[in-house]
Curated annotation (Swiss-Prot):
It is found in: Secreted. Residues 36-97 form the Kazal-like domain. GO terms for molecular function: serine-type endopeptidase inhibitor activity. GO terms for cellular component: extracellular region. Its main location: secreted. GO terms for biological process: negative regulation of acrosome reaction. This is Serine protease inhibitor Kazal-type 13. Keywords: Disulfide bond, Glycoprotein, Protease inhibitor, Secreted, Serine protease inhibitor, Signal. The keyword Signal applies. Glycans are attached at N33. SMART domains: KAZAL (SM00280). It comes from the Eukaryota.
């Protein structure tokens, strides 16, 4: 009886480890389609007072715009769009090439 219980435990452990390995490595290998992500919510970053100095977070989550610039994150992109006009459009998340 002990041998069959040990065999079942090994089989269960093997299945759990194989499943965990598959999930982990498939997430690493899978390409991320940034075009399917939603556009930045710029209204969230627009200052209420025009004299207000924007305080964007120091986070690297690059945004590429139609002006060819890569912004550090969506906050910097949205503030530039607010200051310089709607002709600056969102292209994709990630660096411009």
């Amino acid at each position: 009886m002990k041998r069959s219980g040990c065999w079942h435990q090994r089989m269960l452990l093997s299945l759990v480890l194989l499943t965990w390995t598959h999930v982990t490595f498939s997430a690493l290998i899978r390409s991320h389609n940034f075009s399917r992500w939603p556009k930045p919510p710029c209204k969230m970053y627009y200052p209420i007072d025009p004299d207000y100095e924007a305080n964007c977070p120091d986070v690297k989550a690059y945004v590429c715009a139609t002006n060819g610039l890569t912004y550090k994150n969506e906050c910097f992109f949205c503030i530039d769009r607010w200051e310089f006009g709607p002709h600056i459009q969102f292209v994709k998340y990630g660096k411009c090439e």
